[in-house]
Amino acid sequence: MAAELTSTKLNAENHLLLDQPLLRLPHELARRNFKSVQRLVEREKEYVLPALKETANASLSQSQTPDQTLAALDAMISRMQGLKRKMENLQQEEKKIHAQSRKRIQHLECLHHIPSLADVKYDQWSRIRLDRLIVDQMLRSGYTESAQQLAQEKDIEDLVDLNVFIQCQRIAESLRRGETKDALQWCNENKAALRKSQYNLEFELRLQQYIEMIRTGDKGKLVEARAHARKYLTPFIETQSAEIHRAAGLLAFPKDTKAEPYKSMYAPERWHHLSDLFVRTHHELLSLPSWPLLHIALSAGLSALKTPSCHSAYTSPSSNSLSTTTSVCPICSTELNELARNMPYAHHTKSYVESDPIVLPNGRIYGQQRLLEMSKKVGCVEAGKVKDPTTGEVFDESEMKKVYIM
């Protein structure tokens, strides 16, 4: 009894390892929102305080007319009103982030009030988590509308990051279409954070603009490309000197060149590389996992079930097409086989098999006694015959063959 209770006891801390991004992202968004407020206040302070001091001194010294003083004060009031509107928008955004964080904390807190894995409340909590993981998978795969609809139907909009992934997909798609405007705007908004990034997204975007100017072959565009390189590429000379030298060499090669690395620089596939690079950079800045959470959740179970035969290049001579396609092994299924390919094999030090294994003509192996008992319970099998519980096929008992394990 004690062993059973121990095996079903819920360890909340282990479960929460998978759900760290659930709280990490709102924290990162709140931090960035606060930084935006700081920048706005600092920028306006740098303008308003000197302007106010200058206007006051000019008024006291009577070096400007009252109308000029009023105009200067009106300009400052207008700027402060603009600051107020921006601050109100940021405050509303902060309230949304805090409300979302509160819902997520409440969701995770429920786990600490569930004593056992057998508790019905755990099934309910797990269902919500599964819905979250599916929405995350759909968002990362580009099915944004379906993800939004599922989140609305399950009432988990505060538990998933819809807006973040929708913005990410929008910019990634614009890059695949050959547009850099949205991505460069995003880089400008996150300039400070990008300095700490391991990726060189802004440089790659500026380099692509340079390549597109040269691709035209127009003399005016070539002059513009050189000016573009001096303005946007030269600042990266310390970290990207090799790329900048290759970019300079690109001026001597036409777009249909076969010489590498210039052929690759002209290749349309570079846009897909930029799109993937943006997604990786975006996820890094927001502390999002590079892999879908559903894959991470499945990986432990896949590894526990995986055996060398699951990805073997050789199939058993006794196996046929029917036994392969109806396999009960989740690793061998078409849905999970590729996902499990790079997973480590399960570490089994002992094998657990029936004491009287037999093999049926279709290649499936069962314990003889249990198979006979199951066939009797079915009731629709003639005497002297057995029914495969997986495929439903019926065979004569004489067709069963003993299995010997070496």
Swiss-Prot record:
PROSITE patterns: CTLH, LISH, ZF_RING_GID. GO terms for biological process: negative regulation of gluconeogenesis; proteasome-mediated ubiquitin-dependent protein catabolic process. A zinc finger (RING-Gid-type) spans 329-391. Residues 126-158 form the LisH domain. GO terms for cellular component: cytoplasm; GID complex; nucleus. Residues 164-221 form the CTLH domain. It comes from the Eukaryota. The keyword Protease does not apply. Transmembrane segments: none annotated. Pfam families: CTLH. SMART domains: CRA (SM00757), CTLH (SM00668). Keywords: Cytoplasm, Metal-binding, Nucleus, Zinc, Zinc-finger. Involved in the proteasome-dependent degradation of fructose-1,6-bisphosphatase. Belongs to the FYV10 family. This is Protein fyv10. It comes from Aspergillus terreus (strain NIH 2624 / FGSC A1156).
